[in-house]
Each structure stands twice: as C-alpha cells, then as structure tokens.
Amino acid sequence: MAATIVSVKARQIFDSRGNPTVEVDVCCSDGTFARAAVPSGASTGVYEALELRDGGSDYLGKGVSKAVDNVNSVIAPALIGKDPTSQAELDNFMVQQLDGTKNEWGWCKQKLGANAILAVSLAICKAGAIIKKIPLYQHIANLAGNKQLVLPVPAFNVINGGSHAGNKLAMQEFMILPTGAASFKEAMKMGVEVYHNLKSVIKKKYGQDATNVGDEGGFAPNIQENKEGLELLKTAIEKAGYTGKVVIGMDVAASEFYNDKDKTYDLNFKEENNDGSQKISGDSLKNVYKSFVSEYPIVSIEDPFDQDDWEHYAKMTAEIGEQVQIVGDDLLVTNPTRVAKAIQEKSCNALLLKVNQIGSVTESIEAVKMSKRAGWGVMTSHRSGETEDTFIADLAVGLATGQIKTGAPCRSERLAKYNQLLRIEEELGAAAVYAGAKFRAPVEPY
C-alpha cells in the first residue's frame, strides 16, 4: 500500500527580515513528516504570481493568515488520501482546480496565493523523497528526468545597492563566482576568502560602519558609482590571490530605476535632490554595460533593463550574449509563458529560477527544462527575505542548474543553503561534479 497524505498544516513564521511568511507540515500514512517554508522578495517583478498578504495594520499589512487559512481550510482537506510522490499531479490539482485563476501569462494563483500553494508543493516534494528513500536532490532530478547531478557555482552577492541597501548605489548586486574552483568545497573557500578580503578593503577605504551587512549578507558601503563597486571586487579578488579563478556577476534590477513615461533609466534614482541629470536611454545603458564588460571579468548580468524593455534585452543579448550571460529575472519571473516568449525573441540567454515567482515545483521544473532546451543557462536563486529552509540547494543539484545565488557567505539563512550543498557534495563522494567553468551549460538538455 503506497503512503498517502494524512495531514497538511500551515502556520505563519518569520523570514530573515522579520516579515511573516508561510510554513507547511505534511504528514503521511507511513509516518513520513516533511516541512517547508517559502521566502519573499523585495524587488518583485510585476508579473510574479500573487503573494497573498493580509493588508490592514497588523504586521504593517504583511501578515499571511489568509494564505495560512487557504492551506488549512481549502488545500489540506483536498489533499488527504493523495500520493505525495505524484508531484505534477498534485501541483496541477492545486494550481488549476483548487485555485484556477489565470491571466495572460498563465496560472496566477490569485485566489489561494502562490505562497500558500508553493509551501505545500515544497513540503510534498520533500515528503515524496522520504517515501522513496532517496535524497531530495535525486527525487527532484527524477521528477525532471535529469540523469546528471551537478554542484552549482555559487554566486555570492557581496556588495549590495539598489532596493536592498541604504546607500546611493543604483545597481542592486555585485557578485563573485569562483568558476576556477575544482569542487564546491573549494569554491566556498575562495568565496569566503574574497569576502573577508573585501571586508578589510572596504573598512580601510570607507571606515568601520561601511562593513555593516545588508539583507543578503553583502556590504553596502556608501559609494555612488557602480564602477567603484566593480573596482572593489577586482581588488578583493586580487588580494585573495584568485585573479582569473573568481569572476564577477551583476544583478542590476533596472526595473527599479526605469521611468516608463520618457523610457529612460535614472542611475541617480536614490538621490533625494535628484535633478534627473543622470537619466539615460536604453542604448546608453547598454553601452555602460559593454564598457564594464571590457574592463572587468564579468560573466553574468541580470535584469540589465526594465521588465517590459524586450527591445534592449534582445539588442544586448545579440551584441554580448556570447561572452556574457544575460539573465532574465523580472523579465521572466520563472514563468514558462514568458520564458517561451523570450526564447522566441532571443531576449536573453539565461533564466533566474525563483520558485516563489511561479508558485509550484512542477512549473519551476518546466521553466528550467524549456530554458535548457533553448541552450540557456539557469541560475537558481534565493529571495532577499529568506528562511532556514534549504530546498533550493537540492533543487540546484537535482536540476543541474550549474549556478546558485543565495547571498554572501554571511547570515545563517544564506549559509543554510551553502552548507547543505557542502553536505550534498560530501554525500555524492567520487560521483560529485562541480560545474566550474561550464556553469552556463553543465549538462546536456533533458
């Protein structure tokens, strides 16, 4: 007799920013117990599936009691007696039948909330792995039909700007990727050493308080020029002795400083007395990136333009997409419909995989498979509001995404994922493969 679900219980817990989020426990007839919690983002794309919040004055409107109630009163009774190893069936049942809301980009989870559905989807996935007596990463690989497990290159967000930081920096994340490491363990060593070198460089140049950390564990020194951020990384990499082995990635989050009225980008958007003198066109911004790429070892640029600026995405991908990965986050929001459009229009060449943007494990797998078949790279990602849940570490290995960004090597909700990857690499032993320089295409499409 196959194990079946006997209970599904949701509760409100807190993320790393002190905001409420949803956690779900699933119990099965064979005694299996699994628990999962969902994250939430600060710079959210307008096309993301609905994250249901309560509104009102409690928790400044960010409570999730409605989402919790939706799990406990709508989803839970409907899942009792079902087989937790049937991931796609249960995800589709929740998304299409229990929720059933759609917009032009597909199933939008407006009724129950993507945070409610995803928490259950993640917990079911963990339960399925336990029932099958296999590691979670292997269960995910099996669900996707992937034969080759790969440890991802970590992209450590070590300098914060944009909506994540109180400084004047327009661009949101400056990352280091240890592509020259031979294993994930060595990648962690390189990342940590560059991080500590960066800390001392910043402290010396900007003073003690410049090494306070942001939401994702990176530093937010009060620098204004984006180029200065790149210069700091270059110096820290040199000081650590990893020039050529550690490269640079950026997440610009350009939607945050795009002006839809005059179609310009304002690199001075955080300045109180902003006179608009720093506003530039999409073409000018593209040239800024090209100059960065010619001067620094940049291998990845995420969200270089607004989430609706398909035109400049395509131009940039055509011009520098060979040497640099152009990653769609707000552009794609892990949505298979938007991924299909971007593939057709050659808008970018990599997917940022955030499970809570789409709201189920099955739809996330679909977006990854589509991306890989198009020859794209895939970067698994956390959100700025995280929990101690480590699901995305197993997800990155199981789907062989080749890359993961889950913050700096600082703050326990970030290290939880990196530490889980260390355990997975150890468990795989001689079979462990680190993506390294092949981070954009670590395996054949599946």
Swiss-Prot record:
Q: Where does Mg(2+) bind?
A: 251, 302, 329
Superkingdom of this entry's organism?
Eukaryota
The active site of this protein is located at 216 (proton donor), 354 (proton acceptor)
- Write down the required cofactor(s): Mg(2+)
SMART domains tied to this protein: Enolase_C (SM01192), Enolase_N (SM01193)
Q: Which pathway does it operate in?
A: Carbohydrate degradation; glycolysis; pyruvate from D-glyceraldehyde 3-phosphate: step 4/5
SUPFAM superfamilies assigned to the protein according to its UniProt record, in alphabetical order = Enolase C-terminal domain-like, Enolase N-terminal domain-like
Under catalytic activity, the entry for this protein gives: (2R)-2-phosphoglycerate = phosphoenolpyruvate + H2O
What InterPro entries does UniProt report for this protein, alphabetically?
Enolase, Enolase-like_C_sf, Enolase-like_N, Enolase_C, Enolase_CS, Enolase_N
Q: What is its main location?
A: cytoplasm
Q: Which cysteines are joined by disulfide bonds?
A: none
- Enzyme Commission designation: 4.2.1.11
Instruction: Give the residues the record marks as binding substrate.
Output: 164, 173, 302, 329, 381-384, 405
Q: Which UniProt keywords apply?
A: Cytoplasm, Glycolysis, Lyase, Magnesium, Metal-binding
Query: Which Gene Ontology cellular component annotation is one that this UniProt entry carries?
Result: phosphopyruvate hydratase complex
Q: What GO terms describe the biological role, i.e. biological process, of this protein?
A: glycolytic process
Q: Name one GO molecular function term.
A: magnesium ion binding
Q: Keyword Cytoplasm: yes or no?
A: yes
- Subunit structure of this entry? Homodimer.
Family annotation (NCBIfam families): eno (TIGR01060)
Q: Name the family the entry cites.
A: Belongs to the enolase family.
Name the UniProt record assigns to this protein: Enolase
Give the organism the record lists. Oryza sativa subsp. japonica (Rice)
What's the gene?
Answer: ENO1
